[in-house]
A protein has these predicted regions:
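Phosphate-binding P-loop
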Residues: 1-2, 69
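P-loop NTPase Walker A phosphate-binding motif
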Residues: 5-28
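C-terminal alpha-helical "lid" subdomain
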Residues: 12-20, 122, 139-200
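Conserved NTP-binding/hydrolysis module of P-loop NTPases
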Residues: 27-30, 39-56
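Conserved alpha-helical scaffold flanking the Walker A/P-loop in AAA+ ATPase domains
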Residues: 55-73
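Conserved P-loop NTPase "ATPase switch" module shared by AAA+ and STAND
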Residues: 68-90, 109
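Substrate-engagement module of ASCE P-loop NTPases
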Residues: 95-105, 110
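Short regulatory helix/loop adjacent to the ATP-binding pocket of P-loop NTPases
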Residues: 113-128
């Protein structure tokens, strides 16, 4: 049974933080794809992350990775899969690892990666779950602020933050800015007026 998933969305929506959290929960291996990454590079990193000394030849590396993953199955997360889209051999290596070991593989990418991956029919057919990260709504922003901020925000101030940004990375920066501002000015709460004066 295929066990591949795809998570994608625009930058700044919290994909990386979500997969790092998920990787810790699942004891998963993370491979962060890079421009020009080859099958050998992928396998060498994977084998190293599995605690083995990588062999030289790609075929030996592949067998080494498969043996280790069969012995101790661990989910693999491939972040920045976009970098591998035009590398058929790299895509096939990931597919073959999945097929040989049966381990779950989660692919993480940007905006239209689902459409780009769909051109690899035999690969894309193995993806059983697809989740798209979308910008946050007001309630999401409120939850993030209330969870992460050391200083409370009025709902009207949260609305100002929401209008300014609904992407995770930017919201975290705004929270840090207001925490520092509150500490410096001894604010007990972030009001709409404070939020507007700093963000608008």
């Amino acid at each position: 049974v295929p066990k591949m998933g795809l998570v994608f969305g625009e930058p700044g929506l919290g994909k990386t933080n979500a997969i790092l959290w998920w990787a810790i929960q699942q004891d998963a291996l993370i491979i962060t794809a890079k421009n020009g990454m080859t099958p050998r590079w992928i396998l060498k990193q994977l084998v190293s992350d599995l605690g083995e000394a990588p062999k030289i030849l790609v075929t030996d590396l592949f067998e080494q990775a498969v043996a280790k993953l069969v012995e101790n199955p661990r989910m693999i997360i491939v972040d920045e899969i976009d970098y591998l889209i035009n590398n058929t051999r790299a895509i096939k290596t990931i597919r073959d690892l999945h097929d040989e070991t049966g381990i779950p593989i989660l692919l993480v990418g940007m905006g239209a990666v689902d459409k780009k991956l769909s051109r690899y029919k035999h690969f894309f057919d193995r993806i059983v779950e697809i989740y798209r990260f979308i910008p946050f709504d007001f309630e999401d922003v409120k939850t993030i602020i209330n969870t992460l901020s050391d200083i409370p925000f009025e709902d009207a101030a949260i609305e100002v933050v929401y209008q300014k940004s609904n992407r995770f990375r930017q919201i975290v920066k705004i929270i840090l800015k207001f925490e520092n501002l509150a500490k410096t000015n001894e604010y007990k709460i972030i009001t709409k007026h404070i939020a507007e004066s700093e963000l608008l």
